[in-house]
Design a protein with these regions (language model features):
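Terminal alpha-helical segments
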Residues: 1-122
Length: 122
């Protein structure tokens, strides 16, 4: 997975947010984080043909934040927080609020930015 996919998803999240499509913004924001985490894992030599969401989250947290200390543990936490919001956005009857979408987009931007820095420094 190349970081380009994460960049594209982040752009889509920003566009959706601008259009007031908060559920879609959160969903695309989460996927930008998921794709960036996948790119980080691959850059660290942990490539798989396919990742489950739980497997990717656990490996990112355990391997890249706890064991190797390549990234802040806050990034692993934020990945989980935004995934929970994505579940609301994609699967529940309730909608994501503008405030929630704002926070999720900020977390997605920071996550992708930190992963880009980590990959380019690694």
């Amino acid at each position: 997975m190349e970081i380009a996919k994460a960049n594209e998803s982040l752009k889509a999240a920003e566009h959706c947010y601008t259009e007031g499509l908060y559920n879609s913004s959160v969903s695309r924001g989460y996927y930008s984080m998921y794709q960036a985490a996948q790119a980080a894992l691959e850059a660290a030599g942990l490539k798989r043909a396919e990742w489950t969401h739980g497997g990717l989250h656990a490996t990112f947290a355990n391997e890249l934040t706890r064991r190797r200390k390549l990234y802040s543990s806050f990034l692993a936490r934020d990945l989980n927080v935004v995934q929970d919001l994505r579940h609301t956005a994609d699967y529940r009857d309730s909608d994501v609020s503008k405030r929630q979408a704002t926070r999720a987009l900020a977390k997605a931007r920071e996550f992708v930015s930190q992963i880009k820095k980590g990959i380019s420094n690694g």
